[in-house]
Amino acid sequence: MAAAGGGGGGAAGRAYSFKVVLLGEGCVGKTSLVLRYCENKFNDKHITTLQASFLTKKLNIGGKRVNLAIWDTAGQERFHALGPIYYRDSNGAILVYDITDEDSFQKVKNWVKELRKMLGNEICLCIVGNKIDLEKERHVSIQEAESYAESVGAKHYHTSAKQNKGIEELFLDLCKRMIETAQVDERAKGNGSSQPGAARRGVQIIDDEPQAQSSGGGCCSSG
């Protein structure tokens, strides 16, 4: 769900709240990416996520305040059926694979199909090849991964949670894309469009003045 709040400050002063979900197989490093981004922490020991965990991050991008609600989902097969519960109303999805594990890349394709089926083309997709610190053990070709990402309307990124590479760029770019999508929805609403895609994502404009603040949608209220 995305909420854009604006008072008298115009577009530059808008505040946006976005929901981002991380998907991928177990052991690809989803939790490590989130912890590195939100808390600048890294643990060499494998961290198993059970069901889903939730972290928040606040940013300022070109004068626009952004609140991110980041959902880190479990990768184990037995939790896959719970996926729709967590990625419902998401504005962005980060689909992570391990560059040393071809099967984890193939599983990303299944997630893409499911997201497109459930959320359509409005959700911003990022396909991420993690663990580039293990480049010598790579089993997924860069060309194949980038070609696939382009074919499904996603952007491809390379990251290393261990070395803290590519993570800031990943989230910054995703935020910019989600802002652009929200602005398109706002313009469509201003032109009288019924904007079914925006309604499905819960995009709304909120008066940012103190007397008109809404108490709902508190997914980014902590962190």
Swiss-Prot record:
**Gene transcribed to yield this protein:** RAB21
Q: Does the keyword Ribonucleoprotein apply?
A: no
Query: So which cofactors does this thing need?
Result: Mg(2+)
Keyword Transcription among UniProt keywords: no
Which residues are covalently lipidated (S-geranylgeranyl cysteine)? 219-220
Species name for this entry?
Canis lupus familiaris (Dog)
- Positions where Cysteine methyl ester occurs in the chain: 220
The protein's GO terms of the molecular function aspect are: GDP binding; GTP binding; GTPase activity
Subunit structure and binding partners: Interacts with the cytoplasmic tail of integrins ITGA1, ITGA2, ITGA5, ITGA6, ITGA11 and ITGB1; this interaction is dependent upon its GDP/GTP cycle. Interacts with ANKRD27. Interacts (active GTP-bound form) with TMED10; the interaction is indirect and regulates TMED10 abundance and localization at the Golgi.
Q: What is this protein called?
A: Ras-related protein Rab-21
E.C. no: 3.6.5.2
